[in-house]
Curated annotation (Swiss-Prot):
GO molecular function: succinate dehydrogenase activity
One annotated Gene Ontology cellular component of this protein: plasma membrane
Family: Belongs to the FrdC family.
Record-linked Pfam families: Fumarate_red_C
Annotated localization: Cell inner membrane
Name of protein: Fumarate reductase subunit C
Keywords: Cell inner membrane, Cell membrane, Membrane, Transmembrane, Transmembrane helix
Role noted for this protein: Two distinct, membrane-bound, FAD-containing enzymes are responsible for the catalysis of fumarate and succinate interconversion; fumarate reductase is used in anaerobic growth, and succinate dehydrogenase is used in aerobic growth. Anchors the catalytic components of the fumarate reductase complex to the cell inner membrane, binds quinones.
Matching HAMAP family: Fumarate_red_C
Organism from which the protein derives: Enterobacter sp. (strain 638)
Domain of life per record: Bacteria
Membrane topology: Multi-pass membrane protein
Transmembrane segments: 60-80, 110-130
Statement: the UniProt record of this protein carries the keyword rRNA processing: no
Gene encoding the protein: frdC
Length: 131
């Protein structure tokens, strides 16, 4: 049986996400995908510049030294750190770790993830700068 009645659809303003801080932060976190796209394009440009020889690589390095690009890269870094922070805070909620019959709190897991991140970053920087 079909009906000709129109279903009620509650009006939803386009600014619905601005009402609660939780939704604003959610939109900010999801917005970190946009700077990730910029970084991906920049990385691909660098790979192709590396492939095409020293002159193209020098052009790429000059591009990276542009003040606008430096500011964009700082924004990308901030977005990546925010995204990392939210994922590290989510990780303990996804795994129940039981030590000596008691559930472990989220702090050791989060601190461990940050420690691993710091160690890997230090190793990569050491290899890149001094190897």
């Amino acid at each position: 049986m079909t009906t000709k009645r129109k279903a009620y659809v509650r009006p939803m303003p386009s600014t619905w996400w601005k009402k609660l801080p939780f939704y604003r932060f959610y939109m900010l976190r999801e917005g970190t995908a946009v700077p990730a796209v910029w970084f991906s394009l920049e990385l691909m440009y660098g790979v192709f510049a590396l492939k095409h020889g020293p002159e193209t690589w020098a052009d790429f390095v000059g591009f990276l030294q542009n003040p606008v690009v430096l500011i964009l890269n700082l924004i990308v870094l901030a977005a990546a750190l925010l995204h990392t922070k939210t994922w590290f805070e989510l990780a303990p909620k996804a795994a129940n770790i039981i030590v000596k019959g008691e559930k472990m709190g989220p702090e050791p897991v989060i601190k461990g993830l940050w420690a691993v991140t710091a160690v890997v970053t230090a190793v990569v920087l050491f290899v890149a700068l001094f190897w």
